[in-house]
């Protein structure tokens, strides 16, 4: 069984990666509030091991409000109101998955535990400043994560919502993997084709056609 350490462990020794961590450390040391907390920056990889990945949902950078980000794209900690993009994901789920009921939270850990890699392409952000760490070099790291999944796994589902995710996933081998694209679930664009995309049921149909168990998208209320 290959682990993330086997596949991308050497990235940690690369100068660019050390430079990322140095910049994040300097930001925290200077008194800036950086999300998510240090122990949660790599949560997506801890919760969804390399060989366990079935579905990859690509986000952008972490939420930049207090207590929101915890290392999984689109997810927020329990007790925090689900942000608008996630509410649109829930809205689509109610239309797409029979019986889906919107939970009272936005904590997507149960998805991660079933093999949904919730991958932001930038893994840290300064409080209140969207995209503030976009130039740190995280994109190089997450490009290599996606490249490793593309090359060393097969029959994955990639959900690419919005132009940023679609650009990030442009090199995915569509002969080996299933790629679904739609506008971003943000309120600015959801009505242009995210709502009605049926990506959640399409994902499960593909997985079942490969003899894999479907994702249970329903989240129990907390």
Swiss-Prot record:
User: What Pfam families does this protein's entry cite?
Assistant: UDG
Q: Write out the annotated subcellular location.
A: Cytoplasm
Residues forming the catalytic site: 61 (proton acceptor)
The answer to whether UniProt assigns keyword Acyltransferase to this entry is no
Named from the GO MF annotations, one term is: uracil DNA N-glycosylase activity
Show the PANTHER family listed in the entry. Answer: URACIL-DNA GLYCOSYLASE (PTHR11264:SF0)
Q: What is this protein called?
A: Uracil-DNA glycosylase
Task: Recall the taxonomic lineage recorded for the source organism.
Answer: Bacteria, Pseudomonadati, Pseudomonadota, Gammaproteobacteria, Pasteurellales
**Gene field:** ung
């Amino acid at each position: 069984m290959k682990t993330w350490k086997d596949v991308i462990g050497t990235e940690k020794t690369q100068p660019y990666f050390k430079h990322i961590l140095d910049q994040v450390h300097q930001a925290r040391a200077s008194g800036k509030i950086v999300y998510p907390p240090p122990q949660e920056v790599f949560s997506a990889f801890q919760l969804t091991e390399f060989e366990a990945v079935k579905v990859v949902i690509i986000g952008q950078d972490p939420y930049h409000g207090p207590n929101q980000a915890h290392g999984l794209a689109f997810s927020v900690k329990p007790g925090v109101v689900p942000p608008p993009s996630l509410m649109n994901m829930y809205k689509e789920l109610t239309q797409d998955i029979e019986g889906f009921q919107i939970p009272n939270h936005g904590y997507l850990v149960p998805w991660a535990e079933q093999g949904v890699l919730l991958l932001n392409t930038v893994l840290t952000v300064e409080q209140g400043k969207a995209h503030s760490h976009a130039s740190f070099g995280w994109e190089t790291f997450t490009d290599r994560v996606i490249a490793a999944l593309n090359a060393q796994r097969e029959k994955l589902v990639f959900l690419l919502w919005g132009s940023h995710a679609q650009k990030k996933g442009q090199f995915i081998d569509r002969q080996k993997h299933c790629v679904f694209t739609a506008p971003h679930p943000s309120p600015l664009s959801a009505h242009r084709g995210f709502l009605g995309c049926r990506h959640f049921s399409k994902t499960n149909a593909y997985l079942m056609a490969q003899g894999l168990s479907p994702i249970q998208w329903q989240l129990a209320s907390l």
